């Protein structure tokens, strides 16, 4: 096993048994690839911006004498980088410029070109995606969530007997395009077939067929088989196809050639049919009555008068047959129908259809679509054509066409993106077949019928909407304007395009404020799949079926991770290995199985393809050659699990964690947890707040590293090399010679993020985890971010836990926590709050930011500088002034005394009021940063200039430092060059003293190479100078602020929050609770060695919840920590390195058939010591989902670490020193502090705002509300008979308006008298009753 530089420092012992066939894919691929597809040029014009442009352009004028043609587009560069956009509150975007051609023709008909004008036109800004799959919109980081919507195509469904009272099942079909009108086909209770367009009123399906230019005869011909009758004098001869008789009762003896095959009244069976077929009977004699009631298949005309005798679709009667016979017809064609599998639905539908020909059918459709408008033939034809046959209005899309053809069993997956008449006929035929009992309806929740619409596709659709708006305007301008003088630029208005794109990214339901609590919550948010949003479902209308786990979710969508509450099942998470295919369907990887041997070839299958195969599970036992050991293997086939012979198997799962999402795959022993609790565990990990000191989980699953690296919160080496410079804010790496590409430089600089506020007010801070002169390789972690430890995800802390009751303090999931945890700052978190103060231009004059504030004491101004802005580093608490600001006040009437004073002392500052920015109540912290934004043209104050000076100084220092490093890098490259070419020289420094450009070699070829080397450096120097110039310009220029805003001051407060009673904590198994008490260390239960536990949990919280994973984690944690303690003692006692190495190797070797053998032989002594030091706090262990440590292995590890195999130890009571009655389960569990802190929830109300109608106090902290004294609380007081307390609660403390004012007055005056009156809610009740027409009047009873 080859370890990266970071992994060598602390190797995680892996208990996985199965080999890892496929590496975990890049976890943000779904977002990044989709947006790449949107932005990158696609020469075929199938995707992205290119597709949008090609679908709208060329735009022709109404008269056809001019057209605007699209040539190509290019995206410019963003003015500001990501960080600058976040601080300035702007959107990270690039300008889109398009080359258009205006072609003017001489005359409309001949298309002779008169003039061509080409121009590059600006078409608005396109938001860009950052490297981590997010967008910066107006300074905030947002994520566009992928949508799971119904795939375009045709779907066959039934109402399952719910529509009609008889319980009859009514079948329907629906053609859903990507954009355009929906077409529904449906049966009613009488078995007539109808269509609906866009869910309007229904019409018989034959109206649509007639509008497509089919006559009655043609319609019958398409949908029915025929029966020919030959007319004789006394009877009829019927053409016989024996199969058609199956299941019928013979109405007469069926005889032929003197043989009676079937007697009258007998049911015709398969045996009878076989006899008829064997004797090759093709015609039988039938009585005359048999034809009466049959339906004619075509028109029959009188041969002389040419009048119709029988029209198509007419029921035959005796009279009609006589007329036909008289006219000399010898045969008649009828429709073959029966009640079993050839229903007469179309024939019946034709009878209720009032239209006669194409025109009347078109007019009927027009009336249905546009009720109330007088129809004309042209308008009707136009409307019908635009519904399904116009490229502008209808698009089935390539996905839709593929699904359509698959559903109708057409072999090709390509075809027109419009409908044609044969498509409509095929759908009608299939629906009739389903009604006849052939074929099944589709399963709408099957993932083959739902597809993913990702960011790129949604942005493209929005962009197209913007272009359509522009198209209308361009058409008008082409028709109205003077074409000789007009240019493409004059016709295109970029506003509608920008507005459409901006609206989507800013306010679409799927563009969401990124959940940035920790790296996991970021990754999960980007991999989320929502069924809600435009074109999707709504919460209210979604039933149980849509929300439920479907067999096709296997390996595509996680069955565990989904929110609790109204969105359950509608918002899902992508499975670890899932990806989308070219059509947008989810696919998952499988290993190919050939003749019972499992190969390492991997195929990705979508839900549509998967149904055909038999797939073995990942935990099936294989021998070393990949053969199945057992003859019968548990497999999945068509959504069901059963046993199959090993030779029948086609595929095998890739990994045991294939079915779960990233969040669920981080839960160790997930296989031992109940699904409901696992759901809570997966969801609560996303709410964990990054702790001050991160600590890796002792018991992990091996996914931690992938999450930490892919989330983008760590700094990862782009190229290998040596760490040349390092401080808290940047790392510089000298790249390996072989990794330097020609035009590039051999230096990589990584700027670290320091104390930045996240969307959830948590702190983002990166710290280096490499040392000077370390050798790193590409992909190594250089710096840890929030919630990561040595490149592994670390959301919480490993706590020593005991499962036992303790004086009632862990009743109902409460937790008892030791004071030691608080002292060691284990769960201390830093929260950064941003407070902003705006100075505006008002009608009375502009507001001013100043330290000269009226009626404020000197002490309040102590922390402000002369500009009125707080110092960095100041410790502030609730009510302190952060930014002094005064606002002009309206002129007030002055008293004579004031007038006199003003006349003597000049302008007094009484015409301004204090509107300073103060720290909100209940908040205290340290000021860590101040940002000042000044409008262009407004003079900057002293503090702003100071900040500007510091920023410029910092920028110069950075650039010059980088330049120096490049110079030294150049030196090395020159030295390397001279050595390589065997050129002798005295000393390099002497050589470099002169002008190095003047060095000339004898070999001309060397001269060229050397010159190129020097030029490369000079180009770089120039680039750097330019970079510095741009940076200084950005710093010094004014800011683009909202209208009327002169200045914005942002103050950042860092708030340190220790853990306290009321904070919510949780494990990873859904075991959540609230801290009930912080207990002194001396009172906590302790073991024989005097080591106290950190937390005490209630054992009753485990059995009923069935999350046994936490117990196994606790046991394994005890063993891992025990091994750490042994290593710690060995280091303390200065044991020989080879002994330490041997012990660590033995620890790694424990377990049964482990896939990942750890070889410490090639580790140097220095590396062993580093590893041992990192293992002191416990040996980290990975137990992958569904492939984790077994009970035997846990016992083995407990024994090895010197702990009892039961995992239970004797504890002593900290208060009395007595031994507890029985051994207690003690071990280490990974606990998380969730972002539900008591500080944010607690508040107190004195008096405040009231609801307008009921006059009752509002609720909630944001409204400064009160606690509702509800129905049950009233019952409690009634039960105690506390009548006066109850009266007080329901009157003066709530909505008795007069009573509460009097009460306030009385309290101020010092008397506590209460005069309850009429509660306002009673008056509301009276008014509601009056609104029903019942008058209630209150009378005073004397």
From Swiss-Prot:
GO cellular component: DNA-directed RNA polymerase complex
Transmembrane segments: none
Xref: InterPro entries: DNA-dir_RNA_pol_bsu_ext_1_sf, DNA-dir_RNA_pol_bsu_external_1, DNA-dir_RNA_pol_su2, DNA-dir_RNAP_su2_dom, DNA-dir_RNAP_su2_hyb_sf, RNA_pol_bsu_bac, RNA_pol_bsu_CS, RNA_pol_bsu_protrusion
PROSITE patterns documented for this protein: RNA_POL_BETA
Gene Ontology BP annotations: DNA-templated transcription
Family named by the database record: Belongs to the RNA polymerase beta chain family.
Listed name of the protein: DNA-directed RNA polymerase subunit beta
Organism this protein belongs to: Wigglesworthia glossinidia brevipalpis
Protein task: DNA-dependent RNA polymerase catalyzes the transcription of DNA into RNA using the four ribonucleoside triphosphates as substrates.
């Amino acid at each position: 096993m080859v370890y990266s530089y970071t992994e060598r420092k602390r190797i995680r012992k892996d208990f996985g048994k199965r080999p890892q066939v496929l590496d975990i894919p890049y976890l943000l691929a779904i977002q990044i690839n989709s947006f790449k597809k949107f932005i990158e040029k696609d020469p075929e014009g199938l995707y992205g911006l290119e597709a949008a442009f090609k679908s709208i352009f060329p735009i022709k004028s109404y008269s056809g004498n001019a057209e605007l043609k699209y040539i190509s587009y290019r995206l410019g560069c963003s003015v500001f980088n990501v960080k600058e956009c976040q601080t300035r509150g702007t959107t990270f975007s690039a300008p889109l410029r398009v080359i258009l051609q205006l072609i003017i023709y001489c005359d409309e008909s001949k298309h002779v070109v008169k003039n061509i004008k080409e121009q590059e036109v600006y078409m608005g800004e396109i938001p860009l995606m950052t490297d981590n799959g997010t967008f910066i919109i107006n300074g905030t980081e947002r994520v566009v969530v992928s949508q799971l919507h119904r795939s375009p195509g045709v779907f066959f469904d039934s109402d399952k007997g719910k529509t009609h009272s008889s319980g009859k099942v009514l079948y329907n079909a629906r053609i859903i395009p990507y954009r355009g009108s929906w077409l529904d086909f449906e049966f009613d209770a009488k078995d007539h077939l109808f269509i609906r367009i866009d869910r309007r009123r229904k019409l018989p399906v034959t109206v649509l067929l007639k509008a497509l230019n089919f006559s009655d005869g043609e319609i019958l011909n398409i949908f029915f088989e025929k029966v020919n009758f030959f007319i004789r004098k006394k009877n009829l001869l019927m053409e016989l196809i024996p199969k058609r008789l199956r299941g019928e009762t013979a109405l007469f003896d069926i005889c032929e050639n003197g043989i009676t095959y079937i007697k009258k009244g007998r049911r015709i069976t398969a045996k009878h049919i076989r006899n008829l077929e064997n004797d090759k009977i093709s015609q039988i004699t039938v009585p005359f009555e048999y034809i009466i009631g049959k339906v004619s298949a075509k028109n029959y005309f009188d041969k002389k008068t040419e009048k119709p005798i029988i029209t198509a679709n007419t029921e035959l009667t005796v009279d009609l047959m006589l007329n036909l016979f008289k006219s000399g017809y010898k045969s008649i064609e009828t429709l073959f129908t029966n009640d079993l599998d050839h229903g007469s639905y179309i024939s019946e539908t034709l009878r209720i259809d009032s239209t006669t020909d194409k025109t009347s059918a078109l007019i009927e459709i027009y009336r249905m679509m546009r009720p109330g408008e007088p129809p004309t033939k042209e308008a009707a034809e136009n409307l019908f054509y635009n519904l399904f046959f116009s490229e502008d209005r209808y698009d089935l899309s390539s996905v839709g066409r593929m699904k359509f053809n698959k559903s109708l069993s057409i072999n090709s997956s390509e075809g027109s993106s419009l409908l044609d008449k044969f498509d409509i006929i095929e759908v009608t035929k299939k629906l009739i077949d389903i009604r006849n009992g052939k074929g099944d309806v589709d399963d709408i929740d099957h993932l083959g019928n739902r597809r993913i619409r990702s960011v790129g596709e949604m942005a493209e659709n929005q962009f197209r909407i913007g272009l359509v708006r522009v198209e209308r305007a361009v058409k008008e301008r082409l028709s109205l304007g003077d074409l000789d003088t007009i240019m493409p630029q004059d016709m295109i208005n970029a506003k509608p395009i920008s507005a459409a794109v901006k609206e989507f990214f800013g306010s679409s339901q799927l563009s969401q404020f990124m959940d940035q609590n920790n790296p996991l919550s970021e990754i999960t948010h980007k991999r989320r799949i929502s069924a809600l949003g435009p074109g999707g479902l709504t919460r209210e209308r979604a039933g149980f079926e849509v929300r439920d786990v479907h067999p096709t979710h296997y390996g595509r969508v996680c069955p565990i991770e989904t929110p609790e509450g109204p969105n359950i099942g509608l918002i899902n998470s992508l499975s670890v290995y899932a990806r989308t295919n070219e059509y947008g369907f989810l696919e998952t990887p499988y290993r190919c199985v050939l003749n019972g041997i499992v190969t390492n070839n991997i195929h990705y299958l979508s839900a549509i393809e998967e149904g055909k195969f038999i797939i073995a599970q990942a935990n099936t036992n294989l021998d070393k050659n990949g053969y199945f050991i057992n003859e019968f293997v548990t497999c999945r086939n068509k959504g069901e699990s059963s046993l199959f012979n090993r030779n029948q198997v086609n595929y095998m799962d890739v990994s045991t964690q294939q079915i779960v999402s990233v969040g669920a795959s981080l839960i160790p022993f997930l296989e031992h947890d109940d699904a409901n609790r696992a759901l809570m565990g997966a969801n609560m990990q996303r709410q964990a707040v990054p702790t001050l000191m991160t600590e890796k989980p002792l018991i992990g699953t091996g996914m931690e590293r992938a999450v930490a690296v892919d989330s983008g919160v760590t700094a990862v080496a782009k190229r290998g090399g040596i760490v040349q410079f390092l401080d808290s804010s940047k790392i510089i790496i000298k790249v390996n010679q072989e990794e330097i590409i020609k035009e590039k430089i051999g230096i990589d600089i990584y700027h670290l993020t320091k104390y930045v506020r996240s969307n959830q007010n948590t702190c983002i801070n990166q710290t280096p985890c490499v040392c000077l002169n370390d050798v790193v390789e590409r992909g190594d972690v250089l710096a840890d971010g929030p919630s990561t430890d040595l490149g592994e995800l670390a959301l919480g802390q490993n706590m020593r836990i005991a499962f036992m009751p303790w004086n009632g303090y862990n009743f109902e999931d409460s937790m008892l926590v030791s004071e030691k945890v608080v002292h060691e700052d284990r769960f201390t978190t830093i929260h950064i709050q941003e407070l902003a103060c705006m100075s505006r231009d008002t009608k009375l004059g502009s507001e001013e930011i100043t330290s000269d504030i009226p009626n404020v004491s000197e002490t309040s101004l102590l922390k402000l500088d002369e500009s009125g802005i707080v110092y960095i580093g100041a410790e502030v608490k609730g009510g302190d002034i952060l930014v002094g600001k005064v606002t002009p006040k309206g002129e007030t009437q002055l008293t004579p005394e004031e007038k006199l004073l003003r006349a003597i002392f000049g302008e007094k500052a009484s015409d301004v009021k204090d509107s300073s920015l103060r720290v909100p109540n209940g908040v205290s912290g340290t000021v860590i940063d101040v940002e000042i934004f000044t409008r262009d043209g407004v003079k900057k104050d002293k503090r702003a200039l100071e900040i500007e000076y510091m920023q410029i100084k910092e920028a110069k220092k950075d650039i010059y430092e980088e330049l120096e490093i490049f110079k030294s890098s150049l030196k090395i490259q020159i030295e390397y060059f001279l050595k390589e070419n065997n050129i002798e020289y005295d000393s390099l420094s002497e050589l470099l003293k002169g002008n190095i450009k003047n060095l000339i070699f004898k070999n001309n070829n060397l001269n060229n190479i050397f010159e190129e080397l020097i030029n490369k450096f000079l180009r770089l120097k120039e680039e750097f100078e330019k970079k510095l110039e741009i940076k200084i310009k950005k710093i010094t220029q004014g800011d683009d602020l909202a209208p009327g805003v002169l200045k914005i001051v942002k103050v950042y407060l860092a708030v340190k929050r220790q853990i306290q009673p009321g904070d919510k904590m949780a494990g990873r198994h859904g075991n959540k609770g609230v801290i009930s008490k912080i207990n002194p260390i001396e009172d906590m239960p302790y073991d024989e060695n005097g080591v106290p536990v950190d937390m005490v949990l209630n054992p009753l919280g485990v059995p009923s919840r069935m999350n046994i994973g936490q117990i196994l984690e606790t046991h394994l944690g005890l063993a891992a920590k025990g091994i750490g303690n042994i290593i710690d003692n060995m280091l303390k006692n200065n044991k020989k390195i080879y002994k330490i190495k041997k012990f660590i190797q033995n620890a790694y070797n424990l377990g049964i058939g482990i896939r990942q053998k750890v070889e410490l032989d090639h580790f140097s002594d220095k590396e062993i010591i580093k590893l041992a030091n990192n293992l002191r706090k416990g040996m980290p262990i990975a137990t992958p989902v569904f492939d984790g440590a077994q009970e035997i292995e846990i016992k083995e590890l407990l024994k090895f670490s010197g702990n009892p195999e039961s995992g239970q130890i004797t504890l002593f009571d900290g208060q009395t020193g007595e031994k507890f009655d029985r051994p207690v389960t003690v071990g280490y569990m990974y606990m998380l502090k969730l972002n539900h802190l008591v500080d944010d929830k607690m508040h107190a109300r004195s008096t405040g705002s009231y609801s307008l109608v009921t006059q009752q106090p509002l609720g909630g902290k944001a409204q400064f509300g009160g606690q509702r004294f509800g129905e049950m609380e009233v019952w409690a007081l009634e039960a105690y008979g506390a009548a006066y307390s109850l009266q007080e609660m329901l009157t003066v403390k709530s909505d008795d308006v007069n009573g509460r004012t009097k009460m306030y007055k009385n309290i101020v005056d010092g008397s506590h008298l209460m005069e309850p009156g009429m509660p306002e809610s009673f008056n509301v009740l009276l008014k509601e009753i009056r609104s029903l027409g019942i008058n209630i009047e209150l009378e005073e009873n004397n």
